């Protein structure tokens, strides 16, 4: 049911490059065709300040709403309630992002969360790091990674081919949209907090990018960054 709703939202929001009026230099370069690959932006460390840049360069991006909650805060005039949405976006092929948005209505909260998730997009390292497998095909993660957010801590471990994603529903959604098919996970803390759980999983995936590898190790692990060929 959730996947069908996501597909309908994606159809409604098919990106029109011609109608887009970029506000930043990078956005203008993308619209002109000077930049045609999102890897160029990420490798150069350029800031993603417009979600439309991601829409233009990754048209196959999918989104999934993980959670919508009613939250409250105290004000001198009384309690003020807003909706908080948690969303994960990815193309199931090496790119993923997690975002949160708040608003007085559900729709705007989800749209804000989607925009935030697109701006936080990262490349994911995918490989075959399990000693039980060694197939060399990028289907899992290349090595163990840890991430944290709030009280939640997540540890990702490489798994052999065919195991699947042994994880909670939130972590499974993040890993699945990142393009990882097999992985084991360990979780600690209050994983009922959806955003913290999603962000901790996202942090673990991001930490994979900070591990240095020799060319021979990359070849042995079948390591790829971004799109899996």
Curated annotation (Swiss-Prot):
This protein's GO CC annotations: cytosolic small ribosomal subunit
GO annotation, biological process: translation
Pfam families, alphabetized: Ribosomal_S5 (PF00333), Ribosomal_S5_C (PF03719)
UniProt keyword terms in alphabetical order: Ribonucleoprotein, Ribosomal protein, RNA-binding, rRNA-binding
InterPro entries linked: Ribosomal_Su5_D2-typ_SF, Ribosomal_uS5, Ribosomal_uS5_arc, Ribosomal_uS5_C, Ribosomal_uS5_euk/arc, Ribosomal_uS5_N, Ribosomal_uS5_N_CS, Ribsml_uS5_D2-typ_fold_subgr
Domain S5 DRBM residue range list: 61-124
Disulfide bond positions: none
PROSITE patterns (alphabetical): RIBOSOMAL_S5, S5_DSRBD
GO molecular function terms attached to this record: rRNA binding; structural constituent of ribosome
HAMAP family according to UniProt: Ribosomal_uS5_A (MF_01307_A)
Subunit structure: Part of the 30S ribosomal subunit. Contacts protein S4.
The record's note on its domains: The N-terminal domain interacts with the head of the 30S subunit; the C-terminal domain interacts with the body and contacts protein S4. The interaction surface between S4 and S5 is involved in control of translational fidelity.
Family of this protein: Belongs to the universal ribosomal protein uS5 family.
Described function: With S4 and S12 plays an important role in translational accuracy.
PANTHER family from the UniProt entry: 40S RIBOSOMAL PROTEIN S2, RIBOSOMAL S SUBUNIT
Protein known as: Small ribosomal subunit protein uS5
Organism, as annotated: Methanococcus maripaludis (strain C7 / ATCC BAA-1331)
């Amino acid at each position: 049911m959730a996947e069908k709703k996501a597909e309908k939202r994606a159809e409604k929001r098919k990106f029109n490059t011609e109608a887009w009026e970029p506000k930043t230099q990078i956005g203008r370069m993308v619209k002109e065709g000077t930049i045609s690959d999102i890897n160029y932006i990420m490798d150069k460390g350029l800031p993603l300040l417009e979600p439309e840049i991601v829409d233009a360069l990754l048209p196959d991006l999918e989104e999934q709403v993980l959670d919508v909650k009613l939250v409250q805060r105290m004000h001198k005039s009384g309690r003020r309630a807003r909706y908080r949405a948690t969303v994960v976006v990815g193309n199931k092929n090496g790119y993923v992002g997690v975002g949160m948005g708040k608003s007085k209505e559900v729709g705007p909260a989800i749209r804000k969360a989607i925009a935030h998730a697109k701006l936080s997009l990262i490349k994911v390292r995918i490989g075959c790091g399990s000693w039980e497998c060694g197939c060399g095909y990028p289907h899992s993660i290349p090595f163990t990674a840890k991430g944290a957010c709030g009280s939640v801590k997540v540890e990702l471990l490489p798994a052999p081919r065919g195991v699947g994603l042994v994880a909670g529903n939130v972590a499974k959604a993040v890993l699945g949209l990142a393009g990882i098919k097999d992985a084991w996970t360990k979780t600690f803390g209050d994983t009922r907090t959806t955003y913290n759980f999603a962000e901790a999983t996202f942090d673990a995936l991001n930490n994979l990018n900070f591990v240095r590898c020799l060319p021979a190790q990359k070849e042995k692990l079948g390591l790829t960054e971004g799109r899996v060929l």
